[in-house]
A protein has these predicted regions:
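Histidine-centered divalent metal-coordination motifs
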Residues: 83, 134, 178
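A glycine-centered loop/beta-turn motif at secondary-structure junctions
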Residues: 158-202
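Cysteine-nucleophile active-site neighborhood
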Residues: 48-123, 129, 191
């Protein structure tokens, strides 16, 4: 692979993917290509070192090609899920989704990092603001033993909501918040940490 990382960004029909792309363009020794979820063909995937599953509307079951990609690639190539991608990874491993009491769209929350050793959220100081755009969340109590919670938010009007997790043994990470949002203070650092993790895996 060398030092340059090549990522596939799966576009789940969401305009935020363009913000993800802009952050990726700012990172050194990294190339990428964007594939619309509806055009995914497992038999003809381009060569890649890792995957980013973008945000998107609705729930993971509305994106069957992304779900098939997760089944094929989880544990094989490093994966980062963002928002919808985070929820899809959680469901793949057996966790459940819950609906929030009220949607969070363009909402700023303070991140509480609980796994300082995690190579991705460890790049974000506790208390940093993150941008949230979701009405569903992963039920932290339903996480199987293979998934480790790494960060959460705890706004006064909603209690603790899982914001990040990783797989205990596989190169899988995900976040409910949007690192590419202008609200998120350390989004570039988070994506850079994922690129570093991809290099380390290979």
């Amino acid at each position: 692979m060398g030092s340059t990382v090549h990522l596939l960004v799966i576009d789940n029909r969401d305009s935020f993917v363009y913000n993800v792309v802009e952050l990726l363009r700012s990172l050194p020794e990294l190339t990428f290509e964007v594939i619309p979820e509806g055009e995914l063909e497992l038999s003809s995937l381009p060569e890649h070192d890792g995957l980013i599953l973008s945000p998107g509307p609705g729930v993971p079951s509305e994106f069957p090609r992304m779900q098939a990609l997760i089944r094929a690639e989880a544990g094989v190539k490093p994966i980062l899920g963002i928002c919808l991608g985070h929820q899809a990874l959680a469901e793949h491993y057996g966790a459940r989704l819950v609906q929030l009491p009220a949607p969070r769209h363009g909402h700023a929350s303070a991140l509480v990092v609980i796994d300082l050793a995690d190579s991705l959220v460890g790049a974000i100081p506790t208390g940093s603001l993150v941008g949230r755009y979701h009405s569903w969340a992963v039920d932290e109590a339903s996480l199987p033993t293979g998934l480790v919670p790494t960060a959460y938010c705890a706004d006064a009007d909603e209690g603790r909501v899982l914001m990040a997790m990783r797989h205990r043994t596989e190169p899988v990470w995900s976040v409910q918040f949007h690192p590419e949002s202008m609200i998120s203070e350390y989004g570039r650092a988070y994506l850079s940490a994922f690129a570093t993790a991809v290099r380390a895996w290979h």
